[in-house]
C-alpha cells in the first residue's frame, strides 16, 4: 500500500491511498468463504460451492463493494499511522478507483492538529488577587451555622423573607390544569428562590389560609418554556429563631469549648476555600495568558461540531421547537443572533484551548499515569454520588474514557505550566503554588485540594446539623 499526504490548510489534509489488488485478494477469499456458508446451491454441500458460481449468483460488483467497504477503514488507519498526521474527527473518504483486478484508490480529507509555535513558558508572569479574609465573611459562616441549629416557631402574621411556609401549588396553561405542577404541603423558605420564578414575591404579605395568583414560565415538564398561571395558598407560617453565639452554642455546634475557638476555625475554613479559589484563578489566568500569546489555527469542522452540539443541547428540552427557543431567549433579554454569536465565540475558545493544551503536553512530555486516572475517577464519583466502578462502567458505555484521559492530561499540563511560571499577587508577594500545582502532585493535587476543602466544609457542616444531605449532583451522572 502507498499513501501520500497533501496539506490543504494548516488544519486540514488530504491523504491519497493506493492499495494493490493483490493485498485485497485475501479479503475476497474470506468474503467468499463466508458467502459460501450462507448461500445454498443445488448439488453442493454448505460451504463447498465454487467461487465462480457464487460470483454468478451474487455478482462480482456486489462482492467488490463489500470487500472495499470493509477494507477502506483499516487502510485509512494504516495510512495515518505511517504518517505524522494527527487527525481530529472523522475523515471524508472518496473512492476514486474501484475495479476488480485493479488497484483500489481513495482519498481521505480530515482535520488535523495544526503546528503551533508555543510561547516561552519560563517568561510567563501570573498575577492574581491576594487572599483577604474579612470579619463579615467569618460572620456569614457563623450565621449559617446558627441557622442550622435554629428552631422554627409558628407565627400569626403575614409571611416575609426568611420565613418557612407550607404551601399548596396549582397551575394552568391556556386554561388547562398542569397535573405535574400541582402539589400540597410543600415546605419552602421564603426568599430562597429555590422554586419557580415569582413565587417568593407572591408569598410575601400573605397570611395563613390566603391565596394569590401569579404568572410565570414553566422550566420543566411537557409545558417547559410556556407561560402558566400559578396559584399559591399559604397553609402555615413559621419563623426561625437563632441560638445566641456564645460558648454554649460553640459546644453544641462544634468540637470547640468557646465561641472564640469556633470563630478561629471558621476563619481557617474561609481561608481554605479562598486558597482553592486563588488556585483556580491562577489556573484561569495562566490559560488566559497562553491563549493571548499563541496563534492557534482553528479547524472549522471541529468548531462547527462543537457549535452544533451546544445548539442541540439548548433546544433538545424544547422538542427542537425553534420558535419556543426564540421566545425563551427573548424572555432572557437575548436573541438567536446573539446566542449564535456567543456560541461560536465559546466554541472557538474551547477548541483553541484543547489544541493549545495538547501541543503543550507534547512539548512538556506530560505523561498520564494509572494513578492520575484513578484519582480523577474517584474524584468524579464523589462529585456525582456514585461508586467508582459504577461511574467507570458509565464512561465505558458512552465511550468517554478517551475524553477523560485527554482532560486529565490537559490538567496535568496546565499544572506544569503554572509550576514553572512566576506567580505573584497584586501586592507583589510571591505565591507558593506547590500546594495545588506542585511537581509531585500536578493537576490532580489541585483537584484534590479543592475537593479536600469541600470535604472539610462538609465535615464542619456534619457537626452543625445531622439533617443535612448533599446529593444534588448524582442525578447529572444518572
From Swiss-Prot:
Stored InterPro entries: PPIase_dom_sf, PPIase_FKBP_dom, Trig_fac, Trigger_fac_C, Trigger_fac_C_sf, Trigger_fac_ribosome-bd_bac, Trigger_fac_ribosome-bd_sf, Trigger_fact/SurA_dom_sf
Listed under GO cellular component are:
cytoplasm
Question: Might you name a Gene Ontology BP term for this protein?
Answer: protein transport
Stretches with biased composition (Acidic residues): 448-478
Where does it live in the cell? Answer: Cytoplasm
Query: Primary place of residence?
Result: cytoplasm
* Tagged with keyword Chaperone: yes
User: Which segment of the chain is annotated as a signal peptide?
Assistant: none
Region called Disordered, residue ranges: 424-478
Under which EC number(s) is this enzyme classified? 5.2.1.8
* Protein task: Involved in protein export. Acts as a chaperone by maintaining the newly synthesized protein in an open conformation. Functions as a peptidyl-prolyl cis-trans isomerase.
Which family is annotated?
A: Belongs to the FKBP-type PPIase family. Tig subfamily.
Annotated domain remarks? Consists of 3 domains; the N-terminus binds the ribosome, the middle domain has PPIase activity, while the C-terminus has intrinsic chaperone activity on its own.
Q: Mind telling me what this protein is named?
A: Trigger factor
